[in-house]
Amino acid sequence: NTFELQDEDGTNINSSAFTAYSSAGTASRVYTITSPYTEAQLRDIKFTQSADVMYLVHPDVSIRKLTRTAHTTWTLTEADLLDGPYLDENTTATTMTPSHSSGDDRTITASTSTFASTDVGRLITFDSGYAKIITYTSGTVVKADIKDDFAGTSATTAWSLGAFSDTTGHPAATTFFEQRLVFGSTATEPQSLFFSQSADYENFKAGTDASDAMIFAIASDHVNVIRWLAGTRSLLIGTMGGEFIAKGGGTDSALTPTNIEIRKQSNYGCASIHPLSISNVTVFTQRAKRKLREMVYDYDTDSFVAPDLTILAEHITETGVVEQAYQKEPDSVVWCVLTNGKMVG
């Protein structure tokens, strides 16, 4: 229990006036929990939190829900989304036929090869009702647990497969906005936003009522893969090609399935690094990972602008940023981990 104190120049500090140090107390072990993520995936995890519940997303891993019910009671489970979201309804002649209209471990048969082994865990819906695929048998046959009863057992061309799966990829970004849980970007839908029902975070049953779930895609002349989401006065959307906002049309209008605007604000492009919400601004790393920008609302232009925070010292982050975090106290500091392993703030 002996040690030496030195200042930043390596000079020994005179500790003769310090009180004696003796070992006392023990440090509690940090709580650990098993997760499905590999070390290589850690930096691509995005998350959003509501009280004691946190949702975590990674494009290669199904959505996880971390719940704390006591200081030493934590659970990490797969999020059980209800009735969606789904891809567009089938437009081919392929039919689906369920063996039963209700129950678990029921057979669903496709008229042509449609399924893949990576569809296990994926949702499927018909004219009404939906099920979760639990077993892959072949390209035309799977077994599923029916979560909401089907209307019948007749063959139908009116079916849709879930938007999230190991086949299509899983969301790469998430946040809360206007009482909705929002996911963004999968491998097959890189520009799409998936909104839950209002105040019912895991219910993704879509419709046209104001509180219903909804899916919208960024319409642009380039592919703008969504990198991150942030909920502020508008929903901020960081993409590879630029920065967008989504909000309800009209002054102070809520975002609904029939009232949504998505507008581009700037063209800098974003890295896949979780943004930082600081006061009334959102700090993000530009696509090349060498600049930090703050996305802030500008009353003069009635839009969001993103000035360069590193313009006076661009050499500091020249090697590239891989992680960032915000310290509130005792001083307000944005800390960045660089590709060379150093940390700057």
Residue ranges of model-derived segments:
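Short, surface-exposed terminal/edge motifs of secreted or surface/virion proteins that either
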Residues: T2-E4, H58-E78, T140-A144, T188-F195
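Structural hallmark of WD40 beta-propellers
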Residues: D52, S332-V334
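Elongated alpha-helical scaffolds
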Residues: S35, E39-R64, L181, I237-G238
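Autoprocessing Asn-cyclization modules and mimics
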Residues: N12-T32, R68, W74-W159, V305-T317
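Acidic glycine-/aspartate-rich tracts in secreted/extracellular proteins
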Residues: D9-G10, P59-V61, D148-F150, A187-E189, ...
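Beta-propeller and closely related beta-pinwheel folds
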Residues: Y37, T157-D331
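Aromatic/His-enriched, Gly/Pro-containing loop or helix-boundary segments
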Residues: E8-A51, F150-G162, S211-V225, R263-C270
